[in-house]
From Swiss-Prot:
Ni(2+) binds at H5, E56, H74, E122. Homodimer. Belongs to the glyoxalase I family. This is Lactoylglutathione lyase. Pathway: Secondary metabolite metabolism; methylglyoxal degradation; (R)-lactate from methylglyoxal: step 1/2. Its cofactor is Ni(2+).
Length: 135
């Protein structure tokens, strides 16, 4: 078994694609439209291939906002320079909700941001991912 993708419903597909490409450095891998059921899918990721996990952005035509509820937590992305990545989010008008720094009680460097639709994304500095969270 493997993780194939995580689906996020978005209110403005172009804005979301731009964020995931320009700010997070992902590539647009493919898109698919379904006129009968009125939705468009965009798949983004860092690698293309059967073993690579992807983000699926789903735009339901005419729906511009969703309630997230309390069940969704976040996705996590390893980054080489967490401070520069947070600055790129800020420069794009994004929201940094937890500044980069060590996790409480440990040395793993993390930050939290929100994408244009308010989904939470955790950044973990790559040199920290080897030791695991909380170390």
């Amino acid at each position: 078994m493997q993780i194939l993708h995580t689906m996020l419903r978005v209110g403005d597909l172009d804005r979301s694609i731009k964020f995931y490409q320009d700010v997070l450095g992902m590539r647009l891998l493919r898109t698919s439209e379904n006129p009968e059921y009125k939705y468009t899918l965009a798949f983004l990721g860092y690698e293309d291939g059967e073993s690579a996990a992807e983000i699926e952005l789903t735009y339901n035509w005419g729906v511009d906002k969703y309630e997230h509820g309390t069940a969704y937590g976040h996705i996590a992305i390893g980054v080489d320079d967490i401070y520069a990545t947070c600055e790129a989010v800020r420069a794009s008008g994004g929201n940094v909700t937890r500044e980069a720094g060590p996790v409480k009680g440990g040395s793993t460097v993390i930050a939290f941001v929100e994408d244009p639709d308010g989904y939470k994304i955790e950044f973990i500095e790559n040199k920290s991912t080897k030791s695991g969270l909380g170390n």
